[in-house]
Amino acid sequence: MTSPFRLIVFDLDGTLVDSRRDIADAANALLVSCGAAPMSEERIGHMVGDGAATLVARALEASGIPRPPDALARYLAMYDERLLNHTRPYDGMPKVLDTLGRRAALAVLTNKPIASTRRILDGLDLARYFPADAVVGGDGPFPRKPDPAALRHLVASATATARSTLMVGDSAIDWRTARAAGTQVCLARYGFGFGSVPLHELASDDRVIAAPAELLEL
């Protein structure tokens, strides 16, 4: 089957992998160490998407706890110990990537730090689907999503065009990134960030899927 896309760019958390529990466990470990009560996994999941520093700030603010100067470093160390405890690819995702990789170039664009991103991709045997230079994290040379600079970089590197590129994500951040870059977008209803998507603002050609396998039908 011929793909209408030359490049397909995936978000990581909530799109390629279900990482909510490990993120929540690390955030709660930080909160408890600061004297706060832990939060529900779902509540912390709603704080994910803008990068680790923002997640830490949101969790501490929601708990009414002043932010310690080393809060981010502590969270990253706690997450590093846990990031593969429960994180797994969404059902069917490896098969989907294998098929899509024969139709188009694949890339990852996440606000997660690049070291954690690569550990997850390597640990779950997903790195083989993405060239090393097509994996962009939130602590590299480009501004974090929803700034479109990193997505535009990936488009140019793949010698694609904006309209031949599909951004796949689960959140309003991914949707705004695609809109700013002029690419097409597919939103993952199964992801834990989908509640942030302004459904009433979606364009007629913005796609929404309920499972990874539906990507093969686009």
Segments from the language model and where they lie:
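An amphipathic alpha-helix signature
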Residues: A24, N28, G45, G49-A57, ...
